[in-house]
């Protein structure tokens, strides 16, 4: 009976260690994530510029709307990468982690926008601190695509 339990445990560990559907995604799918992230970076830069130049809430909101739209484009490219990598394995896991990080980052940008509009300096500083903390983590996950998605 012990042997059967041990064999079952080993078999279960092997099944978990060898993802059945994992596959290498096409380079174009991986590259699209990079393109969308570059565009997201430009959107972040536009928000930074708008924060110092906009005189109205509508002007500021316009730059945030563009940022959120590009954030959704990044999210869609990560979903495509996850699907193209067979929805399992190290590449799919990295894509899912990056997607979760992007969702969290976008929530922080929503908080930053709200705090800025309300002129709540402490809340804006807190949201900006979260963004500064999360950005390198997400960048590290995305950089792992170089090894995990080949």
Describe each region flagged by the PLM:
Residues 21-69, 145-150:
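Immediate post-signal-peptide N-terminus of mature secreted/exported proteins
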Residues 7-17:
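Bacterial N-terminal signal peptides
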Residues 1-7:
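Bacterial N-terminal signal peptides that target proteins for export
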Residues 72-99, 145-150:
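Short, solvent-exposed, charged loop/turn and helix-capping segments
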Residues 112, 116-123:
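Short helix-adjacent coil turns
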Residues 31, 58-69, 92-103, 121-136:
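Short, charged, amphipathic alpha-helical segments
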Residues 105-108:
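Extended, amphipathic, non-transmembrane alpha-helical segments
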Residues 37-50, 74-81, 130-139:
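Short, intrinsically disordered, charge-biased short linear motifs at domain edges
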């Amino acid at each position: 009976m012990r042997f059967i339990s041990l064999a079952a445990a080993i078999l279960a560990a092997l099944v978990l260690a060898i993802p059945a559907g994992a596959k290498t995604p096409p380079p174009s799918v991986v590259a699209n994530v990079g393109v969308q992230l570059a565009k997201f970076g430009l959107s972040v830069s536009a928000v930074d510029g708008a924060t110092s130049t906009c005189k109205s809430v509508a002007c500021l909101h316009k730059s945030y709307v563009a940022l959120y739209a590009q954030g959704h484009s990044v999210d869609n490219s990560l979903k495509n990468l996850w699907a193209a990598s067979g929805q399992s394995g190290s590449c799919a896991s990295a894509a899912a982690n990056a997607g979760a990080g992007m969702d969290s980052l976008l929530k922080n940008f929503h908080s930053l926008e709200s705090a800025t509009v309300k002129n709540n300096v402490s809340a804006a500083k807190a949201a900006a601190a979260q963004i500064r903390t999360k950005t390198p983590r997400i960048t590290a996950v995305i950089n792992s695509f170089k090894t995990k998605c080949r």
